[in-house]
Amino acid sequence: MSKRYDVPQEVMETYNYAKIETSKGTIWVKLFKDDAPNTVANFAHLANEGFYNGLKFHRVIPGFMAQGGCPNTREGASGMPGTGGPGWSIDCETDTSLHPHRRGVISMAHAGPNTGGSQFFITFVPTPHLDGVHTVFGAIDLDDKESFQVLDSITQDDDIISIEVVANKS
């Protein structure tokens, strides 16, 4: 059964940005809470609970994307990297193509429709073949050169130090 979130509007209004602290620096992502509300709520819940702290980017394909969010990449975890999740899944929110997979989008990874949980990927380049398949729930602002520099420097097994969902960039 898919997990659904019932987040009060005043709380959803604070889910504006994800601050992704990596071993290479900070990536700021603007969240699309109006277009993918359940996905953003799930990501915010996991981030605010510390789920992502200490994980790794376990799959990085140059010229495509960097994927993280698997708990099996945590120090001492026993499962295979890329196969773990939070213990639940969420439905895809891909009915509309408001946000194509351009460079710098964050999107839910999944093993098939409605199987996403905690794993996400950030695209290095436009990936239109993923439009309508994976839920885009945020993006790096196009003028945020620092975040793009950090994204471009990410390699496999780089650390996700922490992820916070915040109201404002600071």
Predicted regions span which residues?
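Cyclophilin-like peptidyl-prolyl cis-trans isomerases
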Residues: M1-S170
